[in-house]
Amino acid sequence: MIGLSEVTRLEEATRALRELDYRSGGEPCLDGVRLCLRENLPLLTAPASEQVRQRLHVAVADLRNLAGWVCFDAGLVDNAQNHFCHALALAGLARADELTANVCYRLGRVFLHHGHFDEALRYFDLGQLAASRSGDGLAAGLLSGNAAWACAKKGAEHSARMLLDRGRAQFDAASRTGVAGWAAFFTPADLSGLAGAVHADLAVTAGRHYAQTAIVLLTTAIDGYDEGMARSRTLGLISLSTSHLIEGDLEAGVEAGLRALASSGPIGSARVRDRFRPLASHARRHRGHCGARELADRIDAVSAA
């Protein structure tokens, strides 16, 4: 019969793997996550008290949630969706609505990254239902902000701004005590980065005047990330570089882009590599500028490696 000690060890292993993912990207985490799943999935069929079983379902659901995110970051979309589906089933068994909301957020992000914006919005809406059942204001703010991002990518300017305002209000009203590991990344710095990403995409789809606000928000986010959030900082630098180029400040755009390239070196993330490609396209529009030309060429070299 298993006890709380086995569940606690699983929770601690998931926490350590999540920290590695934020710091180094999904690719370096794949083997560790797969090993952790092999070692801990048999616990689901072991005898346990009702209290231990409920907590075990949450812990394994969160490990599946992390496995889905790691696979997504590594470019393994089918594997990611499979893990997320298992996470939803286990979170449902445990009636863990806060975790269900987080899994829906991450599923939405998969579709958002791959350009399926309406599907992303559907998952963000499903997540809002779970967040509302649990009264989880932090999850609600995260989901509203990401729905704003999907709308910005679609060019739905009014909806993007309205949803971003709602997300900020929900974040401000949310309790920050006892935040679960799967949601702990959503700090003021991350909210600023998310708002910056919304404005950066609005600068592309709705008007370049959004670039200046994006620059301010992204700079705040980048300055606020600690060393453990290296991937988030790199993604912020990519968006910052793009926003500077759209605004016409080529020197600042090139500087931010080169910083992004330098910081991406130790990070194993297909998602980061994907996000560099639109930046290279923006840089190529300024081939007469030697720095922009160099930035595009260096991104191409990294992509080809």
Residue locations for each model-derived region?
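Conserved binding/catalytic microenvironments
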Residues: I2-V7, E11-A305
